[in-house]
């Protein structure tokens, strides 16, 4: 009998025929607004590592890599996903390929829609086991009228489609916004969404990178000047946490969980708060009011599976 915790296990849905793209209609995606609709049998979170030959990252600015300017080899930024790809490549004996379809400012509808469609095409053409990481929903949650149950339905549909191909999936939770200016008010919505993420992961046998549990992210030095995106050190530690979430015990927890020296971690001053509001919060609000996005006109930095590391 197979082990239900093994990520190689297929979901409870029937896989599509060769060359056919699975859709949310034929993968048993759950509509969280309709009690009892499409409820799949409870599975378990995936915890055992695999030897992946390919990694596809989809998401928003976090997965694009803002604001990690260390060792940039693709696009404008490096980021946790690029760093994780390098770690996974080091675990793989043969050629490793990586694609990053994430675009700053994207809502979950784009991540679970067009980006997932593109990821499915890459998975279909890939040779060897493939991992797909999904980050999305954070930009939606910032909106006061965000429907968390509707977001969960979108995410569940994307996960179901990807798992139906046999690809493994790493879901990434939002961070805990406690104490953060303005976005701290979203903490309740964030907690509700994270509960959905764990439920979805349990049903489909996914890995989970739980950023809510990463207490080092409460250190302001992990965050860039905009207080939305991470510094290179923040991305480095999250990549290590992701590697550990994928079952790699070689990722020494002390390497990313141990706090930095407290004495050099001053809290922002009121003057810095005012400067942040002027240079970052104000423009962000203006984009929301005018219906624009920082990612307008942009595409992912690696839209094809590319040998990795580059260079």
What positions do the PLM features span?
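Oxyanion-hole/transition-state-stabilizing segment in secreted/luminal serine hydrolases
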Residues: 64-68, 110-150, 177
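Alpha-helical scaffolding segments of alpha/beta enzyme cores, especially the outer helices
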Residues: 150-164, 192-199
């Amino acid at each position: 009998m197979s082990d239900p915790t093994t990520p190689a296990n297929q979901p409870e849905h029937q896989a599509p025929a060769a060359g056919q793209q699975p859709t949310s209609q034929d993968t048993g995606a759950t509509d969280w607004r309709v009690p009892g609709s499409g409820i799949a049998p409870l599975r378990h979170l995936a915890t055992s590592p695999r030897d992946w030959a390919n990694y596809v990252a989809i998401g928003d600015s976090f997965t694009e890599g803002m604001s990690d300017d260390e060792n940039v080899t693709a696009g404008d930024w490096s980021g946790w996903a690029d760093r994780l790809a390098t770690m996974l490549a080091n675990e793989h004996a043969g050629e490793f390929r990586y694609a990053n379809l994430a675009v700053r400012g994207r809502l979950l509808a784009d991540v679970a829609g067009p980006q997932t469609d593109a990821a499915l095409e890459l998975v279909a053409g890939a040779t060897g086991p493939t991992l797909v990481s999904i980050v999305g929903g954070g930009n939606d949650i910032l909106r006061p009228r965000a429907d968390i149950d509707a977001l969960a339905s979108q995410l569940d549909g994307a996960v179901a489609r990807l798992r139906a191909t046999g690809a493994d999936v790493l879901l990434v939770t939002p961070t805990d916004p406690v104490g953060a200016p303005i976005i701290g008010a979203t903490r309740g919505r964030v907690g509700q969404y994270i509960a959905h993420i764990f439920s979805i992961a349990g049903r489909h046998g996914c890995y989970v990178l739980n950023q809510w549990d990463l207490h080092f992210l409460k250190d302001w030095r992990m965050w860039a000047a905009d207080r939305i995106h991470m510094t290179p050190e923040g991305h480095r530690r999250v990549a290590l946490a992701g590697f550990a979430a994928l079952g790699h015990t070689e990722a020494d927890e002390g390497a990313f969980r141990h706090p930095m020296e407290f004495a050099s971690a001053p809290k922002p001053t009121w003057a810095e708060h005012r400067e942040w509001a002027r240079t970052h919060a104000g423009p962000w609000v203006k984009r929301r009011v005018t219906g624009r996005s920082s990612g307008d006109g942009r595409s992912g930095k690696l839209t094809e599976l590319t040998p990795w590391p580059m260079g």
